[in-house]
């Protein structure tokens, strides 16, 4: 029997967090925040920003204030277009907006842009701190609420992200980033259900399409919105191949806006995988990595595809980089283990599987791969019985995990095969001892 594909290699990573645009830049229960503290609930939104602005006295912004702010925005925009963000430029941008905020405390937009500057380089602790300062002053500041939602999403707090995005939309229904964020969460729920005929799946799709249409109604050039829209239509393609045609049209619309958008290239890769065009998929995944070397999902996908091509050295490098960027990525440890196994580094492979097991003992992939490692690769004439017994133990542990029934049936067959092989080995007669070598015949004496 062959090893089930879900355990022989990690799953394709369908880009999520990297799709979400920052709201402050034109659209984009308690858990642990980016700083390790509990996440407080978002403030209650009683009035939208627009309604509050109508009810409050008109804010007068001086010419000097506007000039200082516009100058900082121009620098930010120039860096954005040049893809020039690094720790230094992010901090410089934050300092410029902070100087404007200090000089003009009433200009809350300047303080919010301090957070956006930090967020451009993934300085999430600093960005979160700034956004929280903003909503203390203005609880219905939609852009800051939206960006806090993104931070919590990126740090694995989907429920908190949804709360903040919902609040952001209540504060400002035209926030493209919050709309895309909510649609992304709905897309993830669709994937978990995996049944287009399910009523909940249909409702999630309807809501996701509404949010994405709303986002595009505000910003018709949003490559992020078109990309997520395309991913939504990729779901359910197994029962309706026409959905792939619609998905491709939406991805092409995103490409017209920004073909160098890394999540778009990753989405193209997923599309080509569904079309069984593996070489084109790999090309798209590689393009995504080139555009954004820190793009974890794209690196995972390159690693997954190259495992299939048995390019184990490339897969090893990709999964190693993912672990560097995301040390708690379970699938990356599994992928690295498979790559090292292909490179004949069995000790290294076992170490990676065990790291995955320690990371999440409830998942079964590590146990299954350890079983395969001992059964197919570590067994030899010298330690045959011990290796098979160890493999059987891992298969039995796998059977206690949550997994598809088909994979559990495969594990049961492997256990039965091990038992039969060991039993036959034990019944076999011991090998006949080799006969002692006969003495060489005497040689006649040499003639003088």
Over which residues does each language-model region extend?
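Structural signature of tandem alpha-helical TPR/SEL1-like repeats
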Residues: 84-95, 120-133, 155-167, 189-214, ...
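Terminal, low-structured helical/coil segments at or just beyond the last alpha-helical repeat
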Residues: 376-380, 385-448
